[in-house]
Regions:
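Gly/Gly-Pro-rich "capping" loops immediately C-terminal to redox-active cysteine motifs
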Residues: 28, 44-78, 97-105
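Mature, folded catalytic cores of secreted/periplasmic enzymes
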Residues: 53, 80, 131-134
Length: 141
Protein backbone atom coordinates (compact mmCIF):
# COMPACT_ATOMS: atom_id res chain seq x y z
CA UNK A 1 0.00 0.00 0.00
CA UNK A 2 1.32 3.46 -0.87
CA UNK A 3 0.20 6.53 1.06
CA UNK A 4 1.14 9.93 -0.24
CA UNK A 5 0.30 13.19 1.46
CA UNK A 6 0.62 16.13 -0.90
CA UNK A 7 -0.01 19.73 0.13
CA UNK A 8 -3.66 20.67 -0.50
CA UNK A 9 -4.46 17.14 -1.67
CA UNK A 10 -6.27 14.29 -0.01
CA UNK A 11 -4.24 11.40 1.32
CA UNK A 12 -3.95 9.04 -1.63
CA UNK A 13 -3.72 5.29 -1.24
CA UNK A 14 -2.17 2.93 -3.76
CA UNK A 15 -1.52 -0.77 -3.45
CA UNK A 16 1.60 -2.29 -4.95
CA UNK A 17 0.79 -5.46 -6.86
CA UNK A 18 3.97 -7.55 -7.17
CA UNK A 19 1.87 -10.70 -7.64
CA UNK A 20 -0.16 -9.32 -10.56
CA UNK A 21 1.55 -10.44 -13.80
CA UNK A 22 -0.02 -7.65 -15.89
CA UNK A 23 1.05 -4.89 -13.50
CA UNK A 24 4.54 -6.38 -13.14
CA UNK A 25 4.93 -6.72 -16.92
CA UNK A 26 3.82 -3.11 -17.41
CA UNK A 27 6.21 -2.00 -14.67
CA UNK A 28 9.08 -3.93 -16.28
CA UNK A 29 8.60 -2.03 -19.55
CA UNK A 30 8.57 1.33 -17.79
CA UNK A 31 11.57 0.36 -15.64
CA UNK A 32 13.52 -0.57 -18.79
CA UNK A 33 12.71 2.81 -20.36
CA UNK A 34 13.03 5.09 -17.33
CA UNK A 35 15.18 3.42 -14.66
CA UNK A 36 17.51 0.73 -16.01
CA UNK A 37 20.09 3.13 -17.44
CA UNK A 38 21.05 4.15 -13.90
CA UNK A 39 19.75 1.39 -11.62
CA UNK A 40 20.74 -1.50 -13.91
CA UNK A 41 18.72 -3.91 -16.00
CA UNK A 42 18.20 -6.23 -13.02
CA UNK A 43 18.21 -3.50 -10.37
CA UNK A 44 21.87 -4.03 -9.52
CA UNK A 45 22.63 -0.29 -9.26
CA UNK A 46 25.92 1.46 -9.89
CA UNK A 47 29.25 0.61 -8.30
CA UNK A 48 30.30 2.51 -5.18
CA UNK A 49 26.70 3.65 -4.72
CA UNK A 50 27.32 4.59 -1.08
CA UNK A 51 30.04 7.14 -1.95
CA UNK A 52 29.42 10.51 -3.60
CA UNK A 53 31.18 10.97 -6.92
CA UNK A 54 33.36 13.92 -7.89
CA UNK A 55 30.18 15.65 -9.04
CA UNK A 56 28.83 15.45 -5.48
CA UNK A 57 26.09 13.01 -6.46
CA UNK A 58 25.48 9.55 -5.10
CA UNK A 59 25.48 6.83 -7.77
CA UNK A 60 22.17 5.02 -8.29
CA UNK A 61 21.62 2.43 -5.54
CA UNK A 62 20.61 -1.13 -6.30
CA UNK A 63 16.97 -2.11 -6.01
CA UNK A 64 17.89 -5.74 -5.41
CA UNK A 65 18.28 -7.14 -1.87
CA UNK A 66 21.85 -5.78 -1.62
CA UNK A 67 20.48 -2.23 -1.60
CA UNK A 68 18.21 -0.33 0.74
CA UNK A 69 15.08 0.09 -1.39
CA UNK A 70 13.26 -2.61 0.53
CA UNK A 71 14.13 -0.88 3.83
CA UNK A 72 11.63 1.90 3.01
CA UNK A 73 7.85 1.63 3.13
CA UNK A 74 5.88 1.94 -0.08
CA UNK A 75 4.79 5.47 0.81
CA UNK A 76 8.41 6.68 0.88
CA UNK A 77 9.34 4.84 -2.31
CA UNK A 78 6.37 6.37 -4.10
CA UNK A 79 7.13 9.87 -2.77
CA UNK A 80 10.82 9.68 -3.70
CA UNK A 81 9.93 8.54 -7.21
CA UNK A 82 7.20 11.10 -7.78
CA UNK A 83 8.43 14.15 -5.87
CA UNK A 84 12.15 13.56 -5.27
CA UNK A 85 14.21 12.85 -2.18
CA UNK A 86 14.95 16.52 -1.48
CA UNK A 87 11.25 17.24 -1.03
CA UNK A 88 10.67 14.13 1.05
CA UNK A 89 13.46 15.02 3.49
CA UNK A 90 12.66 18.75 3.25
CA UNK A 91 16.19 19.67 2.16
CA UNK A 92 15.80 21.54 -1.14
CA UNK A 93 19.57 21.72 -1.70
CA UNK A 94 20.09 17.95 -1.35
CA UNK A 95 22.09 16.78 -4.37
CA UNK A 96 20.78 13.79 -6.26
CA UNK A 97 20.81 12.56 -9.84
CA UNK A 98 17.43 10.87 -9.35
CA UNK A 99 14.89 12.58 -11.60
CA UNK A 100 11.51 13.69 -10.30
CA UNK A 101 8.80 11.74 -12.11
CA UNK A 102 5.83 13.98 -11.27
CA UNK A 103 4.22 14.80 -14.64
CA UNK A 104 6.54 12.28 -16.34
CA UNK A 105 4.95 9.07 -15.07
CA UNK A 106 1.37 8.66 -13.90
CA UNK A 107 0.69 7.36 -10.40
CA UNK A 108 -0.36 4.06 -12.00
CA UNK A 109 2.98 3.84 -13.83
CA UNK A 110 4.94 4.60 -10.66
CA UNK A 111 3.03 1.90 -8.79
CA UNK A 112 3.71 -0.53 -11.66
CA UNK A 113 7.46 0.17 -11.56
CA UNK A 114 7.57 -0.24 -7.79
CA UNK A 115 5.53 -3.44 -8.13
CA UNK A 116 8.04 -4.80 -10.66
CA UNK A 117 10.95 -3.94 -8.36
CA UNK A 118 9.29 -5.67 -5.41
CA UNK A 119 8.44 -8.69 -7.57
CA UNK A 120 12.19 -9.22 -8.12
CA UNK A 121 12.94 -9.66 -4.42
CA UNK A 122 13.18 -13.12 -2.85
CA UNK A 123 10.31 -14.17 -0.57
CA UNK A 124 12.15 -13.40 2.69
CA UNK A 125 12.89 -9.81 1.60
CA UNK A 126 9.31 -9.31 0.41
CA UNK A 127 8.04 -10.57 3.76
CA UNK A 128 10.32 -8.17 5.63
CA UNK A 129 9.20 -5.33 3.36
CA UNK A 130 5.56 -6.20 4.05
CA UNK A 131 6.35 -5.94 7.77
CA UNK A 132 7.93 -2.51 7.21
CA UNK A 133 4.78 -1.43 5.35
CA UNK A 134 2.56 -2.69 8.15
CA UNK A 135 4.60 -0.80 10.76
CA UNK A 136 4.46 2.35 8.63
CA UNK A 137 0.70 1.98 8.21
CA UNK A 138 0.21 1.58 11.97
CA UNK A 139 2.30 4.69 12.62
CA UNK A 140 0.22 6.72 10.16
CA UNK A 141 2.98 7.00 7.57
Amino acid sequence: MVLVNRPSAKLQTYTLRPDDPQVVSFGARIYAQQCAACHGVRGEGQSDWRERGTDGLLPAPPHDPSGHTWHHPDSQLFAITKFGLAKLIEQPDYKTAMPIYDRVLSDHEIVAVLSWIKAQWPPDVRTRHDEINEAARKSGM
